[in-house]
Amino acid sequence: MENFFNQFFENIGEDKNREGLKETPKRVQELWKFLYKGYKEDPRVALKSAYFQGVCDEMIVAQNIEFYSTCEHHLLPFLGNISLGYIPKEKIVGISAIAKLIEIYSKRLQIQERLTTQITETFDEIIEPRGVIVVCEAKHLCMSMQGVQKQNAIIKTSVLRGLFKKDPKTRAEFMQLLKS
């Protein structure tokens, strides 16, 4: 890792021995362990250990769960919030498990579209609800800092399964709950 940073500093014309940079390789290495710890965790385990048999058959919504991730194209952050709604069949999941699921997938190199899909598919596979919907809204620093330099652009993605995909009324109810 140190060789990588020494080469990086040299390539951009920086002095690797400058006081403020001496410990940077170590600090960044520790930061990267945290930012990409999702590779060392199994999202299925997070859900399997946190559900219980439930009697609720109405929509449950976890809204505005904050996240940040790293764009795999430019290695710059994208951040925002995710809302997940589901209609249970037999299993109800603890809300903290939804946040953990989001954290595990977001702590990997990502694109927003895949992040949204992975969360939806894993939730659908493990919890087996009658329907699940995930909406992700994020600001991408790669759009703000370089290229088109659009500071206020928000990207929205959604993935729907089951009743949310088949029934427009169910989908509309979820969207209305997000607005309220």
From Swiss-Prot:
Upper classification of the organism: Bacteria, Pseudomonadati, Campylobacterota, Epsilonproteobacteria, Campylobacterales
PROSITE patterns (alphabetical): GTP_CYCLOHYDROL_1_1, GTP_CYCLOHYDROL_1_2
Classification via Gene3D superfamilies: 1.10.286.10, 3.30.1130.10
Keyword presence, RNA-binding: no
Binding residues for Zn(2+): 71, 74, 142
Enzyme class: hydrolase
Protein name: GTP cyclohydrolase 1
GO cellular component: cytoplasm
Pathway it works in: Cofactor biosynthesis; 7,8-dihydroneopterin triphosphate biosynthesis; 7,8-dihydroneopterin triphosphate from GTP: step 1/1
EC number, as in UniProt: 3.5.4.16
PANTHER family assigned to the protein according to its UniProt record, in alphabetical order: GTP CYCLOHYDROLASE 1, GTP CYCLOHYDROLASE I
InterPro entries, per the entry: GTP-CH-I_C/QueF, GTP-CH-I_N, GTP_CycHdrlase_I, GTP_CycHdrlase_I_CS, GTP_CycHdrlase_I_dom
Protein keywords: GTP-binding, Hydrolase, Metal-binding, Nucleotide-binding, One-carbon metabolism, Zinc
Entry similarity comment: Belongs to the GTP cyclohydrolase I family.
NCBIfam families: folE (TIGR00063), PRK09347.1-2 (NF006825), PRK09347.1-3 (NF006826)
Subunit structure: Toroid-shaped homodecamer, composed of two pentamers of five dimers.
Protein species of origin: Helicobacter pylori (strain HPAG1)
BP term (GO), one: tetrahydrobiopterin biosynthetic process
Reaction(s) catalysed (UniProt annotation): GTP + H2O = 7,8-dihydroneopterin 3'-triphosphate + formate + H(+)
Pfam families, per database record: GTP_cyclohydroI
GO terms, molecular function: GTP binding; GTP cyclohydrolase I activity; zinc ion binding
